[in-house]
């Protein structure tokens, strides 16, 4: 934060946190694939690569983040995997946010990448601080918005426990 991202990463890694940025890891037989994800909207409202170059660059970033997630998931050889994102892959977990900002909260491209893999048993994301706790990808994978402002009111604590 505040231009100190590298320092934050260094501190977290020195404390034993595994940074998933565009890669995967396995803990106790469960695979975790991470990507930031990106924005662009959901379903029929998803922004397409047309018109001005700036829009095409924007859409390319959303496509690239979905590819990074897909590659991280593909690298896992586990029966159970969790996709870890910042941005939402479905509109259901951003419900509660103003409709006008939905396109800036996530992208369906992420859900399409997730649904390519049968071993993905859950997805977690943040970013939508006023969103809903849970939903499913079109392929049926459970999605959880674990933003603190969503989780704490739901559970009375600033974290959720998921059984994978």
Regions found by a protein language model. Give the residues of each.
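Histidine-centered divalent metal-coordination motifs
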Residues: 86, 127-129
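Binuclear metal-dependent phosphoesterase catalytic core
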Residues: 26, 108-121, 129-164
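Metal-dependent catalytic neighborhoods of phosphoester/phosphodiester hydrolases
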Residues: 1-15, 94-98, 131-139
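Binuclear metal-dependent hydrolase catalytic cores centered on His/Asp/Glu-rich metal-binding motifs
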Residues: 30-78, 103-108
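Structural motif
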Residues: 30-31, 80-82, 122, 153
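Active-site-proximal beta-strand elements of phosphoester/diester hydrolases
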Residues: 29-41, 82-86, 142-148
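Active-site-proximal segments of metal-dependent phosphoesterases and phosphodiesterases across multiple
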Residues: 48-50, 76-119
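Active-site-adjacent helix-turn-beta-strand microarchitecture at beta-sheet edges
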Residues: 9-12, 17-30
